[in-house]
């Protein structure tokens, strides 16, 4: 177990080192504490939800692994989320999907409303957190031939338009009840496996459907929409209706947030380069932090170069105020609560490291064409003791330092998670 006095000693040394280059570690920690991550609930139950948990997962989405202790009920899922949030420094939000409605009635996706998320709102109030929303456009029989809002069938479009409208009611309810803006993120799986003849008509239908979904005005203090594109998905390799360029233009023209998912691009593209190209024209960003390995594999986020490039871009270009950072990955090969903790803490570490830099001084050097200093300082920063500042941040926020949280996870899975499977077998 990490000793508090050792953490404090290491931090004082780190504080002095950073002060030598004009960086205030206390201010950096204060800035980090203001950043709320949107923690995705679906990591906890492998995207089964509660409306129809036995429905096959579709939309090109897949979860691998069968680690014991999966959450099967609302109480189990919120219990696991509570455990994860207690191990992540700061105050955050939880992102939900339509299929996580809690109701004692048999309801279809297009019938789910605010009343079916009262359970979540009551829980969020107890936790002191906000909620984000995602309408579910997959894992349902009304996904016809891989199409929803862009379907050539009006009945299919109308069904999903209603799902979208209901999700906006729910997100507005979250904002009203919790006093925090709820970001409502729209992603659809529409596209073709093989080469289409007509690429224009599906996109025109999607524009029409989205415009109808967004026709009613809600106070942005309560909720705002984000639209998410993708390069391709399993089963729609040749053509994605909601491409990146499509949603980029839609977001700009309609005053919506543009969602950038780190796994939805070609593996050689640097998503961090997209932010500054969009922000001068757009309202803001919704970021889904993920870890693609050769494709959109949604591995648990780790403190790697890709994540560091993302956070450096946001911090250096002062874009955190207009960026909502969410997690989006799912892994059932490891303890599901630990996946949340690892991914969230990695994201926070990357943000902190980005903040612990003499940014103004480096920008000045760049303006003066002093590229030698720019390269030298940024290289030296890589070996600066930011880990000691991170440990102090955890200590200040009453969360475990280092890997001490693993002991809590081991205890939790033995007492809470593993017995769930034994109960299911017995029943």
Swiss-Prot record:
InterPro entries associated with the record: L-rhamnose_isomerase, Rhamnose_isomerase, Xyl_isomerase-like_sf
Pfam family, one: RhaA
Main location: cytoplasm
Disulfide bond annotation, renumbered to this chain: none
Any one GO molecular-function label of the UniProt entry: L-rhamnose isomerase activity
Keyword annotations of the record: Cytoplasm, Isomerase, Manganese, Metal-binding, Rhamnose metabolism
Entry keyword annotation includes Cell wall biogenesis/degradation: no
Cellular compartments annotated: Cytoplasm
Keyword Disulfide bond applies: no
Pathway linked to the protein: Carbohydrate degradation; L-rhamnose degradation; glycerone phosphate from L-rhamnose: step 1/3
Cofactor binding summary note: Binds 1 Mn(2+) ion per subunit.
Cellular component aspect of the GO annotation: cytoplasm
This protein's name: L-rhamnose isomerase
């Amino acid at each position: 177990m990490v000793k508090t006095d050792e953490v404090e000693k290491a931090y004082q040394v780190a504080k002095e080192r950073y002060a030598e280059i004009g960086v205030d570690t206390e201010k950096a920690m204060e800035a980090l504490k203001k950043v709320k991550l949107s923690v995705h609930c679906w990591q906890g139950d492998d995207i089964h939800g509660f409306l129809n948990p036995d429905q096959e997962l579709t939309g090109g989405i897949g979860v691998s692994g069968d680690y014991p202790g999966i959450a099967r009920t609302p109480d189990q899922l919120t219990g696991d989320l509570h455990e994860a949030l207690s191990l992540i420094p700061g105050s955050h939000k939880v992102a939900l999907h339509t299929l996580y409605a809690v109701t004692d009635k048999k309801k279809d996706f297009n019938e789910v409303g605010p009343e079916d998320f009262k359970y979540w709102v009551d829980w969020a109030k107890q936790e002191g957190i906000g909620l984000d929303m995602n309408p579910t456009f997959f894992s349902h029989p009304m996904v016809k031939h891989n199409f929803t809002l862009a379907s050539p069938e009006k009945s299919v479009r109308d069904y999903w338009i209603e799902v979208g409208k209901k999700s906006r009611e729910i997100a507005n309810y979250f904002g009203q009840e919790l006093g925090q803006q709820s970001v409502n993120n729209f992603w659809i799986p529409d596209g073709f496996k093989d080469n289409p003849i007509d690429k224009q008509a599906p996109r025109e239908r999607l524009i029409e459907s989205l415009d109808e979904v967004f026709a009613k005005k809600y106070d942005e203090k309560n909720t705002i929409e984000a639209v998410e594109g993708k390069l391709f998905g399993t089963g729609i390799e040749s053509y994605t209706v909601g491409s990146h360029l499509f949603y980029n233009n839609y977001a700009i023209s309609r005053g919506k947030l543009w969602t950038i998912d780190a796994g939805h691009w070609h593996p050689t593209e640097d998503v961090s380069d997209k932010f500054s190209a969009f922000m001068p024209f757009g309202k803001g960003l919704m970021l889904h932090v993920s870890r693609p390995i050769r494709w959109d594999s949604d591995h648990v986020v780790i403190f790697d170069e890709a994540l560091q490039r993302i956070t450096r871009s946001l911090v250096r270009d002062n874009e955190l105020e207009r960026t909502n950072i969410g997690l989006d990955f799912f892994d059932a090969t490891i303890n599901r609560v630990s996946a949340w903790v690892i991914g969230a803490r990695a994201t926070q570490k990357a943000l902190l490291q980005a903040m612990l830099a003499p940014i103004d001084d480096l920008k000045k050097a760049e303006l003066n064409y002093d590229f030698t200093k720019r390269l030298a300082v940024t290289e030296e920063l890589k070996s600066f003791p930011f880990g000691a500042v991170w440990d102090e941040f955890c200590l200040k926020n009453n969360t475990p330092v280092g890997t001490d949280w693993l002991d809590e996870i081991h205890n939790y899975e033995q007492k809470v998670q593993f017995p769930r499977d034994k109960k299911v077998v017995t029943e």
